[in-house]
Regions:
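Histidine-acidic metal/acid-base catalytic patches
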Residues: 1-13, 20-37, 60, 67, ...
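Active-site beta-loop-alpha junctions enriched in small/polar residues
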Residues: 15-19, 42-46, 78-80, 125-127, ...
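Alpha/beta catalytic barrel-like cores
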Residues: 20-31, 42-45, 87-91
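Active-site acidic/histidine proton-transfer and metal-coordination neighborhood
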Residues: 25-26, 67-68, 72, 82-188
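Short, conserved active-site loops that position catalytic residues or coordinate cofactors/metal ions
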Residues: 34-48, 75-86
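Glycine-rich, proline-tolerant flexible connector loops at the mouths of alpha/beta enzymes
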Residues: 42-63, 124-128
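A short acidic, helix-capping loop that chelates divalent metal ions and anchors anionic groups
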Residues: 46-50, 83-87, 93, 128-133, ...
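Flexible, glycine- and charge-enriched loops at secondary-structure boundaries
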Residues: 52-59, 94-98, 130-137, 167, ...
């Protein structure tokens, strides 16, 4: 299947966090058959464990397959419970002891280099108890600065993702953080279209335009305004056609990957319906 959207400069992909009941090779086979042209690879169980002694070799093998398929790849780092079996997404970059998170992100950068990834996507985390926003921002700037240096050395850009409920919640927050760091070339933005429904004051079009040329990665899903819950297209309030039109107007050339991490029970069906919805929205833009 040729796949893709006719005339689009960006590639459609799918997130592996929506295929956690499939071995990674099988997920790739399914997505290729459905017409996707890239993958957002979430590191950790069950697909590519960055702390496994064979991870580099596995990444090199994956790189060969992606190259054969002509696929784009981005690295996602939102694995639940990878670093702490009791606390989701902890430690984060705001915690007192963030060493394990920083190690994980350095491994993500290294694996991204092996895979030829467009970028490594990351986020701030929620504000820990008893840490002031000012102190948390100081920690984030200091720790992110070191990761930006690592990304520059590896030749793999970082893409910072604003997340509802986190310290860095909006595109404006992410742009301010980048400015605080001196606007490094190796630090761009990830924008999740569904998040825009929840937290962006100017909606999805305004958020994408604000990110503009700094946009390195796009996650595609629907949401309702009141809840940070990833939904299939048509089950939320996202104007998908307007979002795709804006990406086209911005001449976005990266990956736009569907992110539905709670839908693995019907992954092939969800991926097929998502492709159909994307094709219809593209035609309607």
């Amino acid at each position: 299947m040729s796949g893709g959207l006719p005339g689009a400069g960006f590639a459609l992909g799918y997130g592996t966090n929506g295929f956690t009941d499939h071995p990674l090779d099988d997920a790739i086979t399914v997505l290729d058959r459905l017409g996707y042209r890239g993958i957002a690879l979430t590191l950790g169980h069950p697909h590519l464990d960055p702390f496994d002694g064979e991870a580099d070799r596995a990444a090199a093998r994956l790189r060969r397959r992606f190259d054969d398929l002509g696929w784009r790849v981005v690295i996602e780092t939102g694995t639940r419970y990878l670093l702490d079996p009791f606390r989701k997404h902890r430690p984060n970059l705001l915690d007192d002891d963030a060493d394990l998170r920083e190690l994980f992100l350095r491994r993500a950068i290294d694996l991204g280099a092996i895979l030829g990834a467009d970028c490594v996507s990351l986020w701030s985390g929620v504000l820990p108890d008893e840490v002031s926003p000012e102190a948390a921002h100081d920690r984030l700037r200091a720790r992110l600065d070191g990761l930006v240096g690592r990304a520059e050395e590896a030749g793999v850009p970082l893409a910072f993702e604003p997340e509802p409920g986190m310290l860095v919640e909006t595109v404006a927050d992410a742009l301010a953080l980048r400015a605080d760091l001196g606007d490094p070339d190796a630090l761009g933005l990830t924008v999740d279209l569904g998040h825009c429904v929840v937290v962006e004051p100017d909606g999805v079009v305004g958020a994408l335009r604000a990110a503009g040329p700094l946009l390195r990665n796009v996650q595609v899903d629907d949401m309702l305004p009141a809840a940070h819950e990833h939904l299939e297209f048509g089950h939320g309030s996202l104007d998908l056609a307007a979002a795709l039109r804006t990406l086209d107007e911005l001449d976005y050339r990266g990956l736009a990957a569907v992110e539905l991490p709670r839908h693995a029970h019907d992954a092939p069906g969800v991926a097929a319906r998502s492709m159909t919805a994307l094709e219809h929205a593209w035609e309607a833009r």
